[in-house]
Amino acid sequence: MYKLVLVRHGESEWNKENLFTGWTDVKLSDKGINEALEAGLLLKQEGYSFDIAFSSLLSRANDTLNIILRELGQSYISVKKTWRLNERHYGALQGLNKSETAAKYGEGKVLIWRRSYDVPPMSLDESEDRHPIKDPRYKYIPKRELPSTECLKDTVTRVIPYWTDEIAKEVLGGKKVIVAAHGNSLRALVKYLDNLSEEDVLKLNIPTGIPLVYELDKDLNPIKHYYLGDESKIKSAMESVASQGKLK
C-alpha cells in the first residue's frame, strides 16, 4: 500500500477578501500561515515524514509547503515546482470579488464559472500586464501553453499528465510524497484518482490547509482517503468553500 498526502494552501489574502485569485501570486493571510502550521503539527503528531514534495509556481502553495516541512524538520527534502500544479486560471475574473460578481451576473452564472467542468470565464487579454506571458516565472514555458482562462477540464488536461509522468512514478518507487497545491488543481487530481463524474466534482469542496491522505493499492487505485484533524472543523471548512461566490 502507498500513501499520498495532498494539501491545499492555507488561506491567502485574496481568499480572505473573497476575490478570484487564479494565477495571481498572493501571499498567505495570517490565518493561512496558522493553517499551514497546524497542518505541519498534525502530520508530525500522526508520524508522517516525506521523501519528496511537489508544488506549483505560486507563493501561497510554496509557503504552505515550506511551513509544513519546517514543522516536520524536513526542509531539506527535494521539492519539485511546476506551473502544471498552479491554480485554475480564472481569466478576466481574477481580482474581482466573488459576491459582487454574483450580484452583477447572477449566482448561477458565477457557480458555472467557478465549478462547472467545461465552461471557462471570459479570457484575459494577452496585452494585459497580469497575463502569464508577461510573468518572468513562465518565460521558459511555450506561450501557446499559457492560458488566458481555464475551465476545470483544462486544468485536468495539464495536471494529470504531470501526475502520471512525475508524481505517480515517485509514489510507485516507494517515495513518501506530499503535494501542496490549489483548490482546483487538487480537484483535478482527486477527480482522476477517484474517477469522479463531472457532476460529482462540481460538489467537491477542498478546504484550505487540511491534509488529505490517500491510501493507494499497487496500481494506485484509492483504497480510502481521509482528512486529518477534527471532523467538525473539517466540515465547517468545506462549507466555507462551498459558500464562496454567493450573494451576502
From Swiss-Prot:
This is 2,3-bisphosphoglycerate-dependent phosphoglycerate mutase. It holds the Pfam family His_Phos_1. Belongs to the phosphoglycerate mutase family. BPG-dependent PGAM subfamily. Catalyzes the interconversion of 2-phosphoglycerate and 3-phosphoglycerate. The record marks H182 as: Transition state stabilizer. Keywords: Gluconeogenesis, Glycolysis, Isomerase. Its EC number is 5.4.2.11. It catalyses: (2R)-2-phosphoglycerate = (2R)-3-phosphoglycerate. The keyword Endoplasmic reticulum does not apply. One of its GO terms (biological process) is gluconeogenesis. Pathway: Carbohydrate degradation; glycolysis; pyruvate from D-glyceraldehyde 3-phosphate: step 3/5. The active site is at H9 (tele-phosphohistidine intermediate), E87 (proton donor/acceptor). Substrate binds at residues 8-15, 21-22, 60, 87-90, 98, 114-115, 183-184. It is an enzyme of class 5 (isomerase). GO terms for molecular function: phosphoglycerate mutase activity. The gene is gpmA. InterPro entries: His_Pase_superF_clade-1, His_PPase_superfam, PG/BPGM_mutase_AS, Phosphogly_mut1. It comes from Borrelia garinii subsp. bavariensis (strain ATCC BAA-2496 / DSM 23469 / PBi) (Borreliella bavariensis).
